[in-house]
Amino acid sequence: MADEQHKQDLFIKQQCTNIFRERRPMRLPAELNTITAFAIVCFCFFPASGAADDPKSQPFPQPPSKKGLQVQMVDDAIALGIHHAGININLTALFQPAANDNTIRFSYDGREWLMNGAYAASLDNQIRPLSEKGIVVYVILLAYPSRDPARDAVMLHPNAGGEFTIAGFNTASDDGLRTYRALIAFLAERYSGRHAEHGRVWGWIVGNEVNSQKIWYNLGAMPMKDAASEYEKAVRATHDSVREHSDHGRCYLSFDHFWTGRMPGVSDQESYPTREFLVEFARIARERGDFEWHIAHHPYPDDLGNPRTWLDKLATLSDDSPHITFKNLQVLCEYLKKPELHWNNQPRRIILSEQGLHCLQNEEGETLQAAGFAYVWEKVARQHGIDALIWHRHVDHAHEGGLRLGLWTNKPGTVSEPDRRRHIYELFRKADTDEWPAAVTFALPIVGLESWDAISP
């Protein structure tokens, strides 16, 4: 009976995909039971209460699968059957201190702002083909240093310093915060769904791994409560700008796998346990007037260089676990059930917006990576609080500390030019299809399970 229900669920998903993504006609076989047929018709043709033709009031999409990817090659991503996509946006590149031939002039907050038209067009080329296929697009909002002092003075947090990859947004000065609001307003309007030529964005991830801010959201040395306060200003500004154009667009806080632990070798003024940071952020948000925000978590294994995440020792089932990795995702789901963290009496939603498994350079490397993905997929499928698993990476990247996380290898001598597909590629394609159960039986003895049902929900 369970197998039959599973087949019917997959059939419903496929029919809805045919209708919404491929624009193919619905085909209901004569033997399909009445309840299943009714479910398909209701899901596909009767929108949720309150839905309207106006893009602003459309509800947040509920795609039939959690499968997602940080996309490098759009056509390949679509062929893989993804329903969620992550796209990086470098706000420093979008902002222009002075006009040139490609400038877009944008009026907001009583003044004119200059946007990099060429960069905006490059974002369109990534976002539009994905959203046209019904894929839910999430953007990761980042501030990379440009080495242009005038630009960086506006965009980067003035306390940022030392060696870092990404800076915190400049929420410390009036000019910086106004500029940030204008940039988000520009993007929110452009990708609101009113302009088919640009595409649509539904999810807005603010910064990157802010609990480990020294490297990934540099605010300089400051106590955790001050860092949470600065970050709250950026998230609130994002939410307010997005909601001007989308009643149900979502904003997300970005955290890495350190839960009660924190980044080793870094001071407690530059890295913080996620749990403490989250509680402080929520307190500040309530104090200033609560608003809707959600979680974008990165559950990498304990050791990013070891794909055997099922063996993670620092990921326990305790609320005091040092890490939250793939192995113990339920800890985060349970923690968000605390009433003081709720929004509208419901737990905040979770997406897994960046994570992958390293491919070892030995004869078992590809098999271990693929087996790890099978374990991850089965684990995520059982977590009802998680909406999306957005895999990282599409293609190996030469400047990622020696990690090889891709579905594709990169060509030797290139940074990220695709070379060949790994074993994990076909497994990823088969996820959430009727090919999946047979494709992952090889992984059970590798991860030490007799059945996927043995995975803790």
Region spans (language model):
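Noncatalytic carbohydrate-binding groove/subsite architecture in carbohydrate-active enzymes
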Residues: 183, 188-189, 200, 226-366
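Short, acidic/polar
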Residues: 69-79, 186, 190, 275-283, ...
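Hydrophobic faces of well-ordered beta-strands that scaffold small-molecule active sites
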Residues: 67-69, 85-87, 137-141, 204-206, ...
